[in-house]
């Protein structure tokens, strides 16, 4: 018995593409540690790409699995809001664990927002009914 929704081929390809893109951006970020001339788009983006990647991948993975198992989109929005809250708290309130960095928090929020928009689209068009 299959309880999950059947994703369209393009949906599966797009999810893999998102994770591949995040992986490539992460690799570029870590190469930059050894060679400052290697960066993704700009040096500013390069220094915050890790938070963007983590937020985008985590929200996309959790959201995709929830959609696959027929959960409502509003549950994914709650997950996104929780991720944004955790990100903002971690980047502003816990300076003893992490350097306070509001720009890093903004990149994390942008990652979640992009993921939520993508998940809204695949919720409407990305699965066979």
Residue ranges of model-derived segments:
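Bulky hydrophobic segments
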Residues: 1-129
């Amino acid at each position: 018995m299959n309880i999950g929704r059947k994703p369209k081929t393009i949906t599966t390809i797009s999810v893999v593409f998102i994770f591949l893109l995040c992986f490539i951006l992460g690799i570029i970020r870590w190469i930059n540690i050894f060679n400052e001339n290697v960066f993704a788009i700009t040096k500013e983006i390069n220094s915050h790409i890790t938070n963007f990647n983590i937020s985008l991948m985590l929200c996309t993975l959790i959201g995709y699995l929830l959609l696959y198992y027929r959960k409502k989109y509003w549950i994914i929005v709650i997950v996104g809001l929780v991720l944004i809250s955790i990100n903002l708290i971690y980047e502003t309130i816990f300076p003893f664990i992490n350097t306070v960095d509001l720009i890093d928090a903004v990149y994390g929020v942008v990652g979640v927002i992009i993921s939520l928009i993508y998940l809204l689209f695949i919720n409407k068009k990305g699965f066979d009914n």
